[in-house]
């Protein structure tokens, strides 16, 4: 009896033992794979995002960039009608008249229907991107593509860097061209250093800072930022109504062949005439100095390959101008290209008469008509 009382007393002192207290509580295992799984999930997300952007980019039409977008849309509808295209800057847009080009060839019993796809201020890398978009449009009859030969412009003026036009051409291929240009700038600095002209840190940083300035528009273009409005238009407007609103054809000229007059005064004022005369006499005394660089060379080669791959023949040309320096490819590349140089005032004196110029690098309407006839005549002789 005493034994039972003592046992009961000990149990009361220890308290009641529940099943949960009688078993050890398992500790959670350390989650060593969290960082790896996060990385994998992040990569999957980026991959899906990139694929979605790529599919959407192919689904969306050419951006509605002034002049460029309109010419692309017009070629989408009428590209099969043309056998000859002209591409380049204002020295194409305002200086080559397809109507006169075709008439000059017709007088020599050669059929031609040409279109001026030039755009004000267009230079590589933008020129190559735009050319590739032109060549993606229907072009069953296309045989010849005239391309203005000019250098790559990497240092874009700040006044243009915030525009939609600046952003639209920044794809991976163009970023590659800009990187080639950057490497060329560094190589030039190393060459100068080897010749006793050491470069500063600021000079070495500048090419990279220029390239980095092109990264934001590349990213905006890659994710199709700001282009959802087109998809909204598709849901709200019928195809005919959408075409009616977008296709005004204001940039195509009265003949809808892509040529328009520049709108500048047709005659130089006294100050401009004096400046032109000075540059003209300098070119008579000494021809323009040719230069080339890796970025411009790569851009020219890419355009050469793009046109050749499309089944057409590229003809590069240098317009009539009195600039001190003119881009011209190195001999190895130039040997694979057709290049017509109209920048020599001794060979083409009529193209350099002051009455035919707006300024040292642009012709007026009369000069443009003359240049178009000379271009067509040379083409007629070449294509015999």
Region locations from a protein language model:
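N-terminal Lys/Arg-rich, disordered targeting/topogenic segments
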Residues: 1-36
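Alpha-helical transmembrane signal-anchor/signal-peptide segments
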Residues: 58-80
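Short hydrophobic beta-strand that contains or immediately precedes a catalytic carboxylate
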Residues: 85-88, 363
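Secreted/periplasmic serine-hydrolase-like ester/acetyl group-modifying domain
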Residues: 162-302, 306
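Active-site segments of SGNH/GDSL-like serine hydrolases
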Residues: 301-327
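C-terminal regions of proteins
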Residues: 326-384
């Amino acid at each position: 009896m005493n034994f039972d009382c003592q046992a009961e007393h000990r149990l009361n002192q220890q308290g009641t033992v529940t099943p949960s207290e009688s078993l050890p509580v398992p500790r959670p295992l350390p989650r060593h794979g969290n960082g790896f799984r996060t990385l994998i999930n992040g990569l999957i997300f980026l991959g899906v995002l990139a694929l979605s952007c790529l599919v959407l980019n192919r689904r969306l039409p050419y951006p509605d960039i002034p002049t460029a977008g309109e010419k692309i849309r017009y070629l989408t509808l009428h590209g099969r009608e043309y056998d000859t295209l002209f591409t380049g800057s204002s020295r194409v847009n305002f200086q080559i008249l397809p109507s006169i080009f075709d008439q000059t060839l017709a007088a020599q019993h050669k059929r031609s229907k040409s279109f001026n796809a030039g755009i004000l201020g267009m230079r590589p890398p933008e020129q190559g991107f735009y050319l590739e978009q032109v060549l993606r449009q229907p072009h069953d009859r296309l045989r010849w593509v005239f391309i203005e030969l000019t250098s790559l412009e990497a240092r874009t003026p700040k006044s243009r860097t915030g525009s939609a036009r600046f952003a639209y051409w920044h794809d991976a291929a163009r970023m590659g061209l800009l990187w080639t240009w950057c490497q060329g700038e560094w190589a030039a600095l190393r060459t100068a250093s080897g010749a006793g002209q050491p470069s500063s840190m600021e000079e070495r940083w500048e090419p990279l800072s220029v390239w980095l300035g092109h990264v934001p528009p590349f990213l905006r273009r890659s994710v199709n930022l700001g282009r959802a409005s087109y998809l909204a238009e598709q849901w709200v407007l019928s195809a005919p109504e959408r075409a009616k609103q977008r296709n005004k054809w204001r940039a195509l000229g009265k003949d809808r062949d892509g040529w328009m007059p520049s709108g500048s005064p047709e005659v130089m004022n006294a100050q401009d005439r004096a400046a032109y005369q000075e540059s003209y006499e300098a070119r008579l005394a000494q021809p323009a100095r040719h230069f080339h660089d890796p970025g411009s060379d790569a851009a020219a080669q890419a355009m050469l390959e793009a046109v050749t791959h499309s089944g057409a023949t590229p003809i590069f040309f240098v317009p009539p101008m009195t600039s001190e320096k003119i881009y011209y490819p190195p001999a190895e590349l130039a040997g694979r290209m057709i290049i017509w140089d109209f920048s020599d005032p001794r060979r083409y004196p009529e193209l350099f008469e002051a009455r035919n110029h707006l300024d040292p690098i642009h012709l007026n309407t009369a000069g443009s008509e003359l240049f178009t006839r000379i271009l067509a005549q040379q083409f007629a002789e070449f294509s015999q």
